[in-house]
């Protein structure tokens, strides 16, 4: 009994931490600027389902194993209501969590392996529609769970007994639904899809890692998001393998929890599987915080400004953060830029010399080198040129002087009005 209480206390600690983390993740992913991405819509839904799963784990897995009961009858009465009403809802949340993980894996596969179709296939509206389909399907699939137990006073004093869950009375339900259909819907289909998609994503990311320097900032951000979600998927697969194996073992050996030889080991494995399920749902926010820069930035913004801040406040906050980071980088790089500007004038002339003559523009060539090349062709014509007359030289000199005077002093033109009275002097200035 002490080991069960220790396990219950460990589960309670993980549940409380997970409730805080998933509630924080739900607030972050439900912000307006975060809902613009399809994967953030799915992560918001996953945070909600994990939060619900952890909350329901307290009355199902923690409270029955604590030393809180005066007698067995009170515990039996409590378990009757839990198994009849609360446990089926917990299974619905678990089904939703499994298929939300499948949708996240498929979204990453499209983003990495089919980038041209990502804007058509992966939109926030389609993600919301997929979440709605998952919720309805999980409710319909697990609705029959409400009839696995029924309220009845047994010979031992318990207020419930197995009904559809009893393999002796309802063998078809136990083999068909509880065993085969559960294996197909909760293990074979989701884990096969996730293994196939994640394999393709890992191969594609290995190819992209070779050309990492050629990636844009947006592509690098998508790659870090993919790494984060791959880790979430792997943790999900590891933590849900033992519950699946235990469920299959119970279907093969119906007396696994009743036989005295296997009862202790079966209950210990059952508590361990519950701990792994809770651990998976309670630690996802740690992975988000570790690998997502936007998650950390939004978390700091909410802690500083509260949950009621607007989108414009967030945009101003991110703009100020980018400006501060650019200012820091500019201070370190300013000296390098100034040194480079000093060397640019000298390097520009050396660059001209490195070019072949036929690739140089005439404006880039040195005047001496240009004159040397042209004088070779003009030398024969200079010998036959007639000398200029002195009058031509004098005219050219006077023309240059008049041009200089024309540029230096503006010309003033005075026009006289034609309506001046007769007899007055033709003067441009009249007394007032």
UniProtKB/Swiss-Prot annotation:
Signal peptide per UniProt: none
Transmembrane segments: 9-29, 43-63, 85-105, 129-149, 177-197, 226-246, 272-292
A GO cellular component annotation in the UniProt record: plasma membrane
PROSITE patterns: G_PROTEIN_RECEP_F1_1, G_PROTEIN_RECEP_F1_2
Lineage summary: Eukaryota, Metazoa, Ecdysozoa, Nematoda, Chromadorea
GO biological process, one term: positive regulation of protein secretion
Cytoplasmic side: 30-42, 106-128, 198-225, 293-432
Segments in the Extracellular topological domain: 1-8, 64-84, 150-176, 247-271
MF term (GO), any: G protein-coupled receptor activity
Membrane topology, as annotated: Multi-pass membrane protein
Residue numbers spanned by region Disordered: 328-349, 388-411
Protein localization: Cell membrane
Similarity annotation: Belongs to the G-protein coupled receptor 1 family.
Tissue: Expressed in a subset of neurons in the head, midbody, and tail, including AIY, ASI, BAG, URA, CAN, I6, PVQ, DVA, RIM, and VC, and in the anal sphincter and intestinal muscles. Expression from the ASI neurons is involved in promoting arousal.
Gene from which the chain derives: frpr-18
Disruption-associated phenotype: Decreased locomotion velocity. Restores normal quiescence during molting between larval and adult stages, in neuropeptide receptor npr-1 mutant background.
Protein name per Swiss-Prot or TrEMBL: FMRFamide peptide receptor frpr-18
């Amino acid at each position: 009994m002490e080991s069960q209480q220790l396990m219950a206390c460990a589960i309670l600690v993980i549940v409380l931490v997970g409730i805080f983390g998933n509630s924080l993740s739900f607030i972050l992913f439900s912000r307006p600027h975060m809902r613009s991405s399809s994967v953030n819509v799915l992560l918001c839904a996953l945070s909600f389902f994990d939060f619900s799963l952890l909350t329901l784990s307290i009355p199902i897995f923690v409270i029955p194993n604590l030393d809180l009961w005066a007698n067995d009858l009170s515990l039996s009465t409590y378990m009757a209501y839990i198994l009849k009403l609360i446990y089926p809802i917990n299974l619905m949340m678990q089904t939703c969590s499994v298929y939300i993980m499948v949708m996240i894996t498929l979204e990453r596969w499209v983003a990495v392996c089919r980038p041209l179709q990502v804007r058509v296939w992966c939109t926030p509206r389609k993600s919301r529609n997929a979440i709605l389909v998952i919720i309805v399907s999980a409710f319909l699939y697990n609705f029959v769970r409400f009839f696995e137990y029924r309220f009845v006073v047994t010979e031992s004093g318990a207020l419930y007994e197995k009904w559809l869950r009893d393999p002796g009375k309802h063998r078809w339900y136990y083999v068909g639904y509880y065993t085969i259909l559960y294996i197909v819907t909760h293990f074979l289909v989701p884990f096969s899809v996730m293994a196939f998609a994640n394999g393709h994503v890992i191969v594609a990311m290995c190819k992209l890692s070779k050309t990492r320097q050629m990636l844009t900032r947006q592509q690098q951000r998508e790659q870090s998001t993919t790494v984060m979600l791959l880790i979430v998927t792997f943790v999900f697969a590891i933590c849900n393998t033992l519950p699946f194996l235990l469920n299959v073992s119970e279907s093969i050996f119906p007396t696994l929890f009743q036989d005295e030889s296997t009862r202790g080991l079966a209950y210990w494995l059952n508590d361990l599987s519950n701990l792994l399920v809770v651990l998976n749902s309670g630690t996802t926010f740690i992975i988000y915080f570790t690998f997502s820069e936007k998650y950390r930035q939004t978390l700091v913004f909410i802690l500083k400004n509260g949950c009621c801040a607007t989108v414009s406040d967030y945009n101003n906050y991110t703009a100020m953060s980018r400006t501060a980071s650019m200012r820091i980088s500019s201070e370190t790089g300013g000296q390098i830029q100034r040194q480079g500007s000093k060397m640019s004038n000298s390097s520009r002339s050396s660059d001209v010399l490195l070019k072949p003559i036929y690739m140089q523009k005439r404006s880039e060539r040195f005047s001496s080198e240009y004159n040397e090349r042209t004088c070779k062709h003009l030398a024969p014509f200079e010998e036959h040129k007639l000398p200029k007359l002195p009058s031509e030289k004098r005219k050219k000199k006077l023309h240059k002087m008049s041009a200089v005077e024309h540029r230096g002093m503006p010309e003033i033109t005075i026009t006289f009005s034609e309506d001046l009275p007769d007899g007055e002097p033709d003067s441009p200035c009249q007394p007032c």
